[in-house]
């Protein structure tokens, strides 16, 4: 051990002499304040209303259906106007969006001629709209 002492004295001579062992006295623990469980679960109704959004979409090609589905996945309601797209493409978009709303637990409703309302599960829609010329007859596949 003599070699180690010489080595330590040579390299740590100044630091070793000034070294004082620091000792911290244990501090008394502060009393923990009881947390109120009720406040953590309260959500302001005003903040919920501000975050709700409705997106208007008027796709021109089938590929834009993916963007509409992304809005639905982000919990936004989408009104889709299919009046400016060919009938076959519009049917494909409705089929795609029907699968999307089914997967997320949402709903799709026709609110006008070639106009659909797609909603995620967090949006409730009440009431119904009768289309022109249709009273209580079952809806035909448009």
Swiss-Prot record:
Family according to the record: Belongs to the SepF family.
Subunit note: Homodimer. Interacts with FtsZ.
PANTHER family: CELL DIVISION PROTEIN SEPF (PTHR35798:SF1)
Subcellular locations according to the entry: Cytoplasm
Any Pfam family matching the protein: SepF
Keyword ATP-binding: no
Protein name, per record: Cell division protein SepF
General function of this protein: Cell division protein that is part of the divisome complex and is recruited early to the Z-ring. Probably stimulates Z-ring formation, perhaps through the cross-linking of FtsZ protofilaments. Its function overlaps with FtsA.
Gene3D superfamilies membership: SepF-like protein (3.30.110.150)
Keyword Lyase: no
Keywords from the UniProt entry: Cell cycle, Cell division, Cytoplasm, Septation
Principal location: cytoplasm
Gene Ontology CC annotations of this record: cytoplasm
BP GO terms, sorted: division septum assembly; FtsZ-dependent cytokinesis
Superkingdom of this protein's organism: Bacteria
């Amino acid at each position: 051990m003599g070699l180690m002492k010489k080595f330590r004295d040579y390299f740590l001579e100044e630091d070793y002499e000034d070294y004082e062992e620091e000792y911290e006295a244990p501090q008394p623990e502060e009393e923990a304040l009881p947390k109120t469980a009720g406040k953590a679960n309260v959500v302001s109704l005003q903040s919920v209303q501000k975050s709700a959004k409705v997106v208007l979409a008027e796709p021109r090609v089938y590929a834009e259906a993916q963007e509409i589905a992304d809005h639905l996945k982000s919990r936004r309601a989408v009104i889709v106007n299919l009046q400016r797209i060919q009938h076959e493409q519009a049917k494909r978009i409705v089929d795609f969006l029907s699968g999307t709303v089914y997967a997320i637990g949402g709903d799709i409703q026709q609110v006008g001629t070639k106009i659909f309302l797609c909603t995620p599960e967090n949006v409730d829609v009440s009431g119904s709209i009768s289309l022109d010329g249709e009273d209580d007859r079952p809806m035909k596949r448009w």
